[in-house]
Amino acid sequence: MARSIWKGPFVDGYLIKKVQKLMESGKSEMIKTWSRRSTILPIFVGFTFSVHNGNKFVPVSVNEEMVGKKLGDFAPTRTFYGHGADKKVKRK
Protein backbone atom coordinates (compact mmCIF):
# COMPACT_ATOMS: atom_id res chain seq x y z
CA MET A 1 0.00 0.00 0.00
CA ALA A 2 1.41 3.38 -1.02
CA ARG A 3 1.88 6.33 1.31
CA SER A 4 -1.02 8.79 1.27
CA ILE A 5 -0.40 11.96 -0.72
CA TRP A 6 -1.48 14.37 2.01
CA LYS A 7 1.38 13.17 4.23
CA GLY A 8 4.08 13.92 1.66
CA PRO A 9 7.34 12.03 1.14
CA PHE A 10 9.25 10.77 4.18
CA VAL A 11 12.84 11.94 4.61
CA ASP A 12 14.86 11.77 7.82
CA GLY A 13 15.41 15.28 9.17
CA TYR A 14 19.14 14.94 9.63
CA LEU A 15 19.53 13.98 5.97
CA ILE A 16 17.95 17.23 4.78
CA LYS A 17 20.15 19.21 7.19
CA LYS A 18 23.30 17.51 5.85
CA VAL A 19 22.34 18.26 2.24
CA GLN A 20 21.56 21.90 3.04
CA LYS A 21 24.92 22.31 4.81
CA LEU A 22 26.75 20.92 1.80
CA MET A 23 24.76 23.18 -0.55
CA GLU A 24 25.74 26.24 1.50
CA SER A 25 29.41 25.28 1.72
CA GLY A 26 29.64 24.24 -1.94
CA LYS A 27 31.47 21.03 -1.11
CA SER A 28 30.73 17.70 -2.77
CA GLU A 29 31.31 15.13 -0.04
CA MET A 30 29.72 11.71 0.29
CA ILE A 31 26.82 11.70 2.73
CA LYS A 32 26.96 8.56 4.87
CA THR A 33 23.53 7.29 5.89
CA TRP A 34 21.74 4.28 7.30
CA SER A 35 18.37 5.74 6.27
CA ARG A 36 17.34 3.45 3.41
CA ARG A 37 13.71 4.46 3.99
CA SER A 38 14.20 8.11 2.99
CA THR A 39 12.65 9.29 -0.26
CA ILE A 40 14.95 11.00 -2.78
CA LEU A 41 13.97 14.66 -3.18
CA PRO A 42 14.87 17.00 -6.07
CA ILE A 43 17.40 18.84 -3.86
CA PHE A 44 19.38 15.57 -3.57
CA VAL A 45 20.20 15.53 -7.31
CA GLY A 46 23.94 15.73 -7.89
CA PHE A 47 24.93 14.48 -4.44
CA THR A 48 26.47 11.10 -3.66
CA PHE A 49 25.15 9.12 -0.71
CA SER A 50 26.78 6.16 1.00
CA VAL A 51 23.80 3.95 1.78
CA HIS A 52 24.22 1.07 4.22
CA ASN A 53 23.13 -2.32 2.87
CA GLY A 54 23.49 -4.22 6.15
CA ASN A 55 27.13 -5.10 5.57
CA LYS A 56 28.88 -2.13 3.98
CA PHE A 57 28.14 1.29 2.52
CA VAL A 58 27.22 1.39 -1.17
CA PRO A 59 27.84 4.66 -3.08
CA VAL A 60 24.69 6.00 -4.75
CA SER A 61 24.99 8.98 -7.11
CA VAL A 62 21.59 10.64 -7.35
CA ASN A 63 20.27 11.78 -10.74
CA GLU A 64 16.91 13.12 -11.90
CA GLU A 65 15.43 9.70 -12.72
CA MET A 66 15.81 8.62 -9.08
CA VAL A 67 13.59 11.36 -7.62
CA GLY A 68 10.61 9.87 -5.78
CA LYS A 69 12.24 6.50 -5.11
CA LYS A 70 13.85 5.36 -1.85
CA LEU A 71 17.61 5.42 -1.17
CA GLY A 72 17.46 1.72 -0.28
CA ASP A 73 16.24 0.83 -3.78
CA PHE A 74 19.74 1.50 -5.11
CA ALA A 75 21.71 -0.40 -2.45
CA PRO A 76 20.85 -4.12 -2.77
CA THR A 77 21.01 -6.13 0.44
CA ARG A 78 21.32 -9.59 -1.12
CA THR A 79 23.83 -11.00 -3.58
CA PHE A 80 22.49 -13.34 -6.26
CA TYR A 81 24.98 -16.09 -7.09
CA GLY A 82 22.75 -17.83 -9.62
CA HIS A 83 20.61 -20.91 -9.41
CA GLY A 84 22.11 -24.27 -8.55
CA ALA A 85 23.76 -26.03 -11.48
CA ASP A 86 22.34 -29.32 -12.78
CA LYS A 87 24.50 -32.10 -11.28
CA LYS A 88 23.65 -34.60 -14.03
CA VAL A 89 25.19 -32.39 -16.69
CA LYS A 90 28.44 -31.97 -14.74
CA ARG A 91 29.11 -35.76 -14.56
CA LYS A 92 29.49 -36.18 -18.32
UniProtKB/Swiss-Prot annotation:
GO CC annotation: cytoplasm; small ribosomal subunit
PROSITE patterns xref list: RIBOSOMAL_S19 (PS00323)
rRNA-binding among keywords: yes
Keyword RNA-binding: yes
Pfam family, any one: Ribosomal_S19
Keywords for this protein: Ribonucleoprotein, Ribosomal protein, RNA-binding, rRNA-binding
GO molecular function: rRNA binding; structural constituent of ribosome
GO biological process terms held by the UniProt record: ribosomal small subunit assembly; translation
PANTHER family, sorted: RIBOSOMAL PROTEIN S19P FAMILY MEMBER, SMALL RIBOSOMAL SUBUNIT PROTEIN US19M
Its biological purpose: Protein S19 forms a complex with S13 that binds strongly to the 16S ribosomal RNA.
Family classification: Belongs to the universal ribosomal protein uS19 family.
Name the UniProt record assigns to this protein: Small ribosomal subunit protein uS19
The organism of origin for this protein: Rickettsia akari (strain Hartford)
